[in-house]
């Protein structure tokens, strides 16, 4: 009986250590700068490891002028449960011109149950644009 209890205790400790290690990896790849924007390293980490989309929350005119390759456009004032048809398992990386509208959009998305992060302004994001 003592061997069974010791074995179960050992398995529990191993599971706990693995769970803590995975949590640290997730936390370490999501880092924000002093403005609350994702760091360049965090964006790179998310892109290589996770299922994500890039969301542009500027106006249609701004999007047509210049946008990040493969981003989708949903103006920040149009974000609602009715207009968003994005898988809730995806991480949403949000940007605008300066980061202000993206901040509002991130809060709306979080309220709707999404995992979303503010990338900041388009000119400060080191990703291909078209």
Each model region followed by its residue ranges:
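Structural scaffold elements adjacent to functional motifs in cytosolic proteins
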Residues: 54-56
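Rhodanese-like catalytic fold shared by cysteine-dependent sulfurtransferases
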Residues: 2-8, 16, 20-40, 52, ...
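Short, surface-exposed ligand- or partner-binding patches at beta-edge/loop junctions that are enriched
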Residues: 95-96
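A short acidic-Thr-Gly-centered motif at the start of a beta-strand
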Residues: 43-50
């Amino acid at each position: 009986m003592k061997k069974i209890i010791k074995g179960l205790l050992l398995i529990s400790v191993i599971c706990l250590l693995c769970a803590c290690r995975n949590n640290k990896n997730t936390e370490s790849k999501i880092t924000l700068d002093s403005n609350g924007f994702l760091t360049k390293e965090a964006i790179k980490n998310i892109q290589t490891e996770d299922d994500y989309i890039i969301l542009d929350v500027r106006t249609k005119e701004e999007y047509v002028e210049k946008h990040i390759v493969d981003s989708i456009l949903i103006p920040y004032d149009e974000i609602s449960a009715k207009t968003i048809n994005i898988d809730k398992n995806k991480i949403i990386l949000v940007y605008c011109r300066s980061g202000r509208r993206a901040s509002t959009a991130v809060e709306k998305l979080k309220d709707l149950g999404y995992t979303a992060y503010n990338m900041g302004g388009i000119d400060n994001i080191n990703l291909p644009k078209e």
